[in-house]
Amino acid sequence: MGNYTIAEIVQILIGLFLGIGLLQSGTDKIVDWKGNMSFLTEHFAQTFMRSLVTPMLMVVTVLETVGGILCLGGVAMALLYQNFDLILMGMIVIAFNFVALFAGQRFSKDYAGAAVLVNYFILTIIGILTYYF
């Protein structure tokens, strides 16, 4: 382990935070697919997206799981080799995931749920921006 800049420490911490949260969420969707399908089918029942629940759940599950793995793998790479590329890739995948989740929450008129996602999205964008400033 070498010396890290403040930006690199922030990248590691945000990558760790997002990696844990998103990998857990993606894993939960895989383990409890039936429960998640039931919840989302009801959640989107009164929207034009009701027939898209299965593909939406599949996309979100892949984005969360891949984003989480990239971030956690990236943290390991950063600590072992001072290579931060995987964290950035994970954050980009996770940012797209949050946009998809936000759209779903808004279309289902779950405004409180959409509002909660804003904090995670901002954190993710801050993490991405640390690579460029």
Regions found by a protein language model. Name each.
Residues 1-28, 58, 62-133:
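Extended, low-polarity transmembrane helix blocks
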